C-alpha cells in the first residue's frame, strides 16, 4: 500500500496518468527507474569478518598441528603436511568458488545434490571403485588418493534439507506427511551409512535433521516420537555388533584393557594429562611418537592438549564457539529478514560443525565412545578438509548476501531509515526535478466522464521484497516455530 501511494504521488507530480501524461515525462520516468535499478545492482555486501577470522585461524592451527603430530609417522617428516597443504589449497579454491556463487543458483540444484548423496553412498560398494580400509567401505579410490564420500553427503544433504524447509515450511508445521519426508530420506542415507559401516556419521546426520526440522517449524512433540521409535534399534546396533560394544566398554574404563581395546583412549588421556596448564611446548609431544594411534586425525586434539596445555585447549574451544555462534547469529538474522534458505543453511552448517567438534573433543577427553570423526578444519584428511572448506565458503556467501540485502534495504527506505524485518521494503522512485513537470490542464466542471484508469508504471521492475527475501517463496506464508523458540 505504501509503495502504491508513492507511485500515485509521483504520477500526480507529473500531471496525472494515462493520456494526461506527456511522452517525454514517461520517458524520463523510465530512464530514472533504469538508473535506480543500475545503482541497486551495484550494491555489494561484505563477508562476516569474525566468521572468516575464526575459520582461517582454525585452518592455520591445523597446518601447524598436522606438521607436529605426523613428523614421526613416515620416512619423510613432512609427508602428511605436504598432503594436508595440497588438500587445503583445493579446499580454499572450493571455498572461493562457493563465495562467488549465488545461493539461488545453489538452491536450483538441490534435487541433484540429494541424488549425488545416494550415488556417492552406493558407489563405495561397487568393486573397483570402492576402497576398503580396516573392514569399512567408506572411500572411493581415485588412484592418487581416496575420497570419503560421507563428507560430501553432509554438505549436500544440509543444502537439500534447507531448500525443502523453505518450500514446505507451512506443511512441515501442520502435517505429519511433510515432516516425515525428510525423515524418510535421512533414514535411507543412514541405512547406507550403516552398511559401510559408519555409526558416528549416521548419528550426526540424524541429529542435524532433528534440529533443523525443529528450527524449520516442526513441533518438538512430532520430532520426539520418531526418535523414541528409532532408539531401540540404535541400541540394538551397538549391543549386537562386537566392535561397537568393545568401544563402549573401553570408554567406560580404558585402564582395564590398556594394551587392548583401551589403548587409544588411555594414550590420549596420558597426552592430555602431560599438557597441564601451558603444555610441554610445540613439537615436544611424546605420545605422538608412535604411541598414540591416529595422532594427526581423530586424536589430534590430544596432541594439542599435550603441546599447548589447558590454555591452548581453551583457545581452540573458543574459536569453535565463535565460529558456531556467528553461524547461528547469521541464521537468526536471515530468518528475521525472510531469507529462509540462507538461514537454514547457516543453522545446518553451524549444527554440523558444533556436533562434530563436540564429539571429536569428547572422544579425546574420554566422555564419549570412540568415533571416527575428525576435528573440523584442524585434523588431517583430504575429504574432510575439502568439504569443510566448501561449507565455510557457502556460509561466507550467506553472510555476504545477508549484508547486501541489509544495504539494499537501507537504500530503498526513505532517508536511509531502517525498515523492520517483518515489513519488506518497496522500491522508492527518486523524484525528478520540478523543472521537468508540465503545467496542469484546467479541469472542466463536468461530472460525466470518469477519469481514465492509471496505466501501470514500470511493471517489469521486480518488487524489492523479492530481492530482500532471496530465494524464499514470495507469497505470504506462516513463519516457522523458530520465532517462538527465539
Swiss-Prot record:
Question: What residue ranges lie in the Cytoplasmic compartment?
Answer: 1-50, 99-112, 163-174, 221-222, 320-342, 396-486
Question: Where is this chain's protein located in or outside the cell?
Answer: Cell inner membrane
GO biological process: one example: cell wall organization
Q: Which regions span the lipid bilayer?
A: 51-71, 78-98, 113-133, 142-162, 175-195, 200-220, 223-243, 299-319, 343-363, 375-395
Give the principal location in a single coarse category: membrane
Residues in a coiled coil are none
State the EC number(s). 2.4.99.28
Say if the entry is tagged with keyword Plastid.
no
Q: Which domain of life is it from?
A: Bacteria
Q: What keywords sit in the KW lines?
A: Cell cycle, Cell division, Cell inner membrane, Cell membrane, Cell shape, Cell wall biogenesis/degradation, Glycosyltransferase, Membrane, Peptidoglycan synthesis, Transferase, Transmembrane, Transmembrane helix
Catalytic activities: [GlcNAc-(1->4)-Mur2Ac(oyl-L-Ala-gamma-D-Glu-L-Lys-D-Ala-D-Ala)](n)-di-trans,octa-cis-undecaprenyl diphosphate + beta-D-GlcNAc-(1->4)-Mur2Ac(oyl-L-Ala-gamma-D-Glu-L-Lys-D-Ala-D-Ala)-di-trans,octa-cis-undecaprenyl diphosphate = [GlcNAc-(1->4)-Mur2Ac(oyl-L-Ala-gamma-D-Glu-L-Lys-D-Ala-D-Ala)](n+1)-di-trans,octa-cis-undecaprenyl diphosphate + di-trans,octa-cis-undecaprenyl diphosphate + H(+)
Pathway assignment: Cell wall biogenesis; peptidoglycan biosynthesis
* InterPro entries with a match to the protein in the record: FtsW, FtsW/RodA
Q: Which residues lie on this side of the membrane: Periplasmic?
A: 72-77, 134-141, 196-199, 244-298, 364-374
Membrane topology designation: Multi-pass membrane protein
Function text? Peptidoglycan polymerase that is essential for cell division.
Instruction: Name the NCBIfam families for this protein.
Output: ftsW
The text of the family note is: Belongs to the SEDS family. FtsW subfamily.
Official protein name in the record? Probable peptidoglycan glycosyltransferase FtsW
Q: Which organism is it from?
A: Xanthomonas oryzae pv. oryzae (strain KACC10331 / KXO85)
Amino acid at each position: 500500500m505504501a509503495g502504491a501511494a508513492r507511485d500515485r504521488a509521483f504520477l500526480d507530480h507529473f500531471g496525472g496518468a494515462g493520456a494526461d501524461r506527456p511522452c517525454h515525462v514517461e520517458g524520463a520516468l523510465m530512464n530514472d527507474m533504469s538508473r535506480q535499478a543500475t545503482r541497486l545492482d551495484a550494491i555489494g555486501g561484505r563477508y562476516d569478518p569474525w566468521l572468516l577470522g575464526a575459520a582461517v585461524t582454525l585452518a592455520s592451527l591445523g597446518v601447524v598441528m598436522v606438521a607436529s603430530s605426523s613428523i614421526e609417522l613416515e620416512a619423510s617428516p613432512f609427508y602428511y603436511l605436504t598432503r594436508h597443504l595440497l588438500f587445503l589449497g583445493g579446499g580454499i579454491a572450493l571455498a572461493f568458488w562457493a563465495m562467488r556463487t549465488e545461493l539461488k543458483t545453489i538452491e536450483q540444484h538441490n534435487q541433484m545434490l540429494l541424488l549425488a548423496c545416494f550415488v556417492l553412498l552406493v558407489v563405495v560398494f561397487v568393486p573397483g571403485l570402492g576402497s576398503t580400509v580396516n573392514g569399512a567401505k567408506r572411500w572411493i579410490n581415485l588412484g592418487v588418493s581416496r575420497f570419503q564420500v560421507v563428507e560430501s553427503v553432509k554438505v549436500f544433504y544440509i543444502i537439500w534439507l534447507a531448500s525443502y524447509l523453505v518450500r514446505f515450511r507451512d506443511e512441515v508445521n501442520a502435517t505429519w506427511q511433510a515432516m516425515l519426508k525428510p525423515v524418510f530420506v535421512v533414514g535411507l542415507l543412514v541405512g547406507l551409512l550403516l552398511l559401510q559401516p559408519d555409526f558416528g556419521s549416521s548419528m550426526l546426520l540424524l541429529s542435524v535433521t532433528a534440529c533443523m526440522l525443529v528450527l524449520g517449524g516442526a513441533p518438538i512433540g512430532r520430532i520426539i516420537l520418531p526418535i523414541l521409535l528409532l532408539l531401540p534399534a540404535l541400541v540394538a546396533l551397538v549391543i549386537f555388533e562386537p566392535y561397537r560394544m568393545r568401544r563402549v566398554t573401553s570408554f567406560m574404563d580404558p585402564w582395564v584393557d590398556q594394551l587392548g581395546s583401551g589403548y587409544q583412549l588411555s594414550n590420549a588421556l596420558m597426552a592430555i594429562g602431560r599438557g597441564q596448564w601451558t603444555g610441554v611446548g610445540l613439537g615436544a609431544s611424546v605420545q605422538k611418537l608412535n604411541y598414540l594411534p591416529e595422532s594427526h586425525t581423530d586424536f589430534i586434539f590430544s596432541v594439542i592438549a599435550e603441546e599447548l596445555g589447558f590454555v591452548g585447549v581453551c583457545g581452540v574451544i573458543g574459536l569453535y564457539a565463535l565460529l558456531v555462534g556467528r553461524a547461528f547469529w547469521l541464521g537468526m538474522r536471515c530468518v528475521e529478514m525472510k531469507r529462509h534458505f540462507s538461514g537454514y543453511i547457516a543453522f545446518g552448517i553451524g549444527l554440523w560443525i558444533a556436533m562434530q567438534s563436540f564429539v571429536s573433543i569428547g572422544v579425546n577427553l574420554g566422555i564419549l565412545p570412540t568415533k571416527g570423526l575428525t576435528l573440523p578444519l584442524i585434523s588431517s584428511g583430504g575429504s574432510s578438509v575439502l568439504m569443510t572448506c566448501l561449507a565455510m565458503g557457502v556460509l561466507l556467501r550467506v553472510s555476504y548476501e545477508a549484508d547486501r540485502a541489509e544495504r539494499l534495504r537501507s537504500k530503498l527506505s526513505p532517508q536511509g531509515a531502517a525498515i523492520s524485518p517483518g515489513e519488506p521494503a518497496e522500491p522508492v522512485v527518486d523524484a525528478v526535478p520540478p523543472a521537468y513537470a508540465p503545467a496542469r490542464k484546467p479541469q472542466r466542471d463536468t461530472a460525466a466522464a470518469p477519469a481514465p484508469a492509471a496505466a501501470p508504471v514500470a511493471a517489469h521492475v521486480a518488487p524489492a521484497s523479492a530481492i530482500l527475501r532471496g530465494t524464499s517463496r514470495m507469497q505470504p506464508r506462516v513463519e516457522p516455530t523458530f520465532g517462538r523458540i527465539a
